[in-house]
Amino acid sequence: MGRRFKIESSQDHSQTPPRLGLIFNIQRFSIHDGPGIRTTVFFKGCPLRCRWCSNPESWNDYPEIVTNDVKCTKCGRCQPVCPVDAIVVDQEGRKLNRSLCNLCLKCANVCPTGALAVTGQWMTVGEVMKEVEADGLFYQNSGGGVTLSGGDPLRQWEFALELLKDCKEKGIHTAIETSGYAPWEVLAKVLDYTDLALFDIKHMDAARHQWGTGKGNELILDNARRTAAKVRTWLRMPLIPGYNDSEENLKAVARLGLEIGAEKVSLLPYHIWGKSKYGRLGRQYPMEQTPLPSDDLVKRCEKVIADVGLKATIGR
């Protein structure tokens, strides 16, 4: 099960303290983020804004307020502690004006039910390692280990590097899941302590990639080639109906994988498990009109890639 965190005190997030990482979840017994049984550490902060993202709480590199109106008892404790009058509690319930909120987090600290909570906790490498090492026996028996995900761990690369070093010193298999949108100099340092790269490829066309993620793909494709030349690499592609499921794009992804020596492409079918998170963050979900992929579509896409000569798997 994943673990959600709550900030225990207000913190100034304008400057990240040295060797602290901003983590929004640590998921134990994960089987979808690399080989074996793994612990996945989710880093906050991402350079992309993928329209289908199932972890929108990962985008920003600072702690944020998330709401759960069902849990609100209208007790009113949050209103007086807000220094900018961003909260109003009346008979209809609690209202949070995010345009006024200064992210002091005081409201979440006094909320007794979790109707106001914080996503993102500053942690030391030692604190994360305590979670990671708890399942060492499972890693040994299953060929598993730790996976750094997000967001994108490269947004906090110095902390990620220290964490990976610690894992390697303790004989724990390491993997990173990344968008690849970072300077190669940064990625190369992290890869020195990485056994497996789970490298996301959203679309092979630069313009379509820009539309879907907010960024072009030139840097990403260059880094994919360099990454596969350095460490064992799996490509991962979110399968979004009407966006990147064309035969042309699938063949291009497969050819890229063959060119760079990737072991396989993992197809991750679009889902709406993260849809409710958008409302809890005060955002609109942008994919309301996108259908879920049918089993036939997923199998067809898998076959297109396999016919090019690259192994394809579904969901991991």
Predicted regions and their residues:
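Short gly/ser/thr-rich secondary-structure transition/capping motifs
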Residues: 22-24, 90, 177-181
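Auxiliary Fe-S-binding modules of radical SAM enzymes
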Residues: 1-35, 228, 239-316
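Iron-sulfur cluster-binding cysteine motifs and their immediate structural context
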Residues: 51-58, 77-96, 106-122
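Extended, non-globular alpha-helical segments
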Residues: 69-73, 120-135
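N-terminal pre-triad scaffold of radical SAM enzymes
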Residues: 23-77, 94-103
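Conserved dinucleotide-binding and phosphotransfer motif residues
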Residues: 114, 166-170, 308
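Conserved AdoMet/S-adenosylmethionine-binding subsite of the radical SAM
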Residues: 126-279
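Hydrophobic packing within well-folded, soluble alpha/beta domains
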Residues: 50, 72, 82, 101, ...
